[in-house]
Amino acid sequence: MERPESELIRQSWRAVSRSPLEHGTVLFSRLFALEPSLLPLFQYNGRQFSSPEDCLSSPEFLDHIRKVMLVIDAAVTNVEDLSSLEEYLATLGRKHRAVGVRLSSFSTVGESLLYMLEKCLGPDFTPATRTAWSQLYGAVVQAMSRGWDGE
């Protein structure tokens, strides 16, 4: 990724990373609104959540949100050399495949990520920032998809 795009990503992430749980909850609220069929994939100790709200208030799911935000943070930190995260992201892809996540669902996750960024950043979420984040997310999903492909 080119330096101007990397800077847009880092600058915008600074605002988000001040409240990762709050913004991660926005991301997953949007995800469940767009693709409710994902909710049953989140089960902890055999517990099936009855609603997105039930899931989003669960301590176990809040821990999942924290982990997702840490993965995004790692991608932002390594935005100019994502190859250093390739094996980790492929392993993450395998783990998601193992619990029943469809690769196609990651496009909805991407939409939810952009939604969260827009809500957090307001007018600072410019078209250039949107494009930069779309490129970063696309690279992350490409690396994770190797976990589906078994590469």
From Swiss-Prot:
Molecular function terms, GO-annotated = GDP-dissociation inhibitor activity; heme binding; metal ion binding; nitrite reductase activity; oxygen binding; oxygen carrier activity
Residue limits of the Globin domain? Answer: 1-149
CDD domains, alphabetically?
Ngb
GO cellular component entries:
cytosol; mitochondrial matrix; perikaryon
Gene Ontology process terms (BP): cellular response to hydrogen peroxide; cellular response to hypoxia; negative regulation of apoptotic process; neuron projection development; oxygen transport; response to hypoxia; response to iron ion
Q: Which SUPFAM superfamilies match?
A: Globin-like
User: Per the UniProt record, which EC number(s) apply here?
Assistant: 1.7.-.-
Q: What class of enzyme is it?
A: oxidoreductase
Tissue specificity field: Widely distributed throughout the adult brain, including cerebral cortex, hippocampus, thalamus, hypothalamus, olfactory bulb, and cerebellum.
Q: What does this protein do?
A: Monomeric globin with a bis-histidyl six-coordinate heme-iron atom through which it can bind dioxygen, carbon monoxide and nitric oxide. Could help transport oxygen and increase its availability to the metabolically active neuronal tissues, though its low quantity in tissues as well as its high affinity for dioxygen, which may limit its oxygen-releasing ability, argue against it. The ferrous/deoxygenated form exhibits a nitrite reductase activity and it could produce nitric oxide which in turn inhibits cellular respiration in response to hypoxia.
Q: What is this protein called?
A: Neuroglobin
Species this chain originates from: Rattus norvegicus
